[in-house]
From Swiss-Prot:
Major subcellular site: cytoplasm
InterPro entries: Ntn_hydrolases_N (IPR029055), Proteasome_sua/b (IPR001353), Proteasome_suB-type (IPR023333)
Family that this chain belongs to: Belongs to the peptidase T1B family.
Protein name (Swiss-Prot/TrEMBL): Probable proteasome subunit beta type-6
Pfam families named in the record: Proteasome
SUPFAM superfamilies: N-terminal nucleophile aminohydrolases (Ntn hydrolases)
Lineage, top ranks: Eukaryota, Fungi, Fungi incertae sedis, Microsporidia, Unikaryonidae
Protein's job: Non-catalytic component of the proteasome which degrades poly-ubiquitinated proteins in the cytoplasm and in the nucleus. It is essential for the regulated turnover of proteins and for the removal of misfolded proteins. The proteasome is a multicatalytic proteinase complex that is characterized by its ability to cleave peptides with Arg, Phe, Tyr, Leu, and Glu adjacent to the leaving group at neutral or slightly basic pH. It has an ATP-dependent proteolytic activity.
Length: 290
């Protein structure tokens, strides 16, 4: 038999490997596995014609396990390094309409993961005669706002735009990015002939007219409250009464104070806009800043 650096060659051309480390297949394999071609202690025995095949079976199983473990590890690494273009800057917004006015409110915290980026970032944008709010990825919301302003200015070269046309325009802007959607939950508010309208959207442009809506990280806590006090969805034989402007503001402030106690992304300040036809009044209230 001829000596070889990697193993020992037999006359039949086969190779008897002593250990996996000796063959240098797996440098990070910490446990040395002695190779026993016949399964006999010491590796001695009569080699038959299928001795090499029978001897490789245990090694093949070991290699298979190692390859399987390697694939599982690589899959986990791929999951960690997967491309994710979105970030949840979140916060909370509320829009509700009553009689001849609309209340639009939102907190001013801009956060990402465990970092506070800003304590004075408004989530309420004025687009012509309308108010636009958005939660989710702030950069996407701002891009939607910029596109809305641009398209409305082009439209109003000939004639002024009404709330219904603006609502359809916003839907088209969101739907145009349906294959790589804006991560933004928008609400558009405005008036048409003295009547208030609030339109709520999902990220791909589906929308509908609502009486009250809450979006963002505090939605699960605030929306049931609005459904009860504004829409009276869980009341029996409730009369359809309109709340006054002061009662609506008081309700919104209490709702945000409660959400700020439990939601880390809804903090710092509360910006409240009371919108009437051709008039917008703004007011700021303090929230928890921790």
């Amino acid at each position: 038999m001829l000596s070889n650096k990697r193993g020992i060659h037999s006359a039949s051309g086969g190779i008897d490997l002593r250990t996996l480390r000796e063959y240098c297949l797996f440098e990070d394999f910490d446990v040395c596995m002695p190779f026993n071609p016949m399964g006999v202690p010491g590796g001695k025995g009569n080699r038959g014609s299928d001795g090499a095949i029978r001897g490789m079976l245990p090694l093949g199983d070991a290699m298979g396990d190692l390859f399987t473990a390697g694939k599982a590890g690589s899959t986990k690494m791929e999951d960690k390094e997967r491309f994710d273009p979105y970030e949840d800057n979140s916060g909370t917004t509320i829009c509700l309409k009553q009689g001849d006015f609309i209340v639009v409110a939102g907190d001013t915290r801009h956060s990402s993961s465990m970092v506070i980026n800003s304590r004075e970032m408004s989530k309420i944008f004025q687009v012509g005669d309308f108010l636009l709010t958005g939660t989710g990825f702030y950069a996407d919301t701002h891009e939607v706002y910029v596109k809305m302003v641009y398209e409305i200015r082009q439209y109003e070269v000939d004639d002024s735009i009404n709330i219904h046309s603006a609502a359809n325009l916003l839907s088209k802007i969101l739907y145009s990015k349906r294959f790589f959607p804006y991560y933004s939950f928008c609400v558009l508010s405005g008036f048409e002939k003295g009547k208030p309208y609030v339109y709520s959207y999902d990220p791909i442009g589906s929308f509908g007219s609502v009486t009250c809506v809450c979006s963002g990280s505090g939605r699960s806590m605030i929306q049931p409250l609005l459904d009860s006090f504004i829409d009276k969805k869980n009341w029996n034989n409730a009369e359809e009464t309109q709340l006054s402007q002061e009662d609506c503001i008081r309700l919104v402030v209490k709702a945000f104070n409660s959400a700020a106690e439990r939601d880390v992304k809804t903090k710092d300040n509360l910006e409240v806009c009371v919108m009437r036809e051709n008039q917008v009044m703004r007011e700021t209230f303090p929230l928890r800043r921790d």
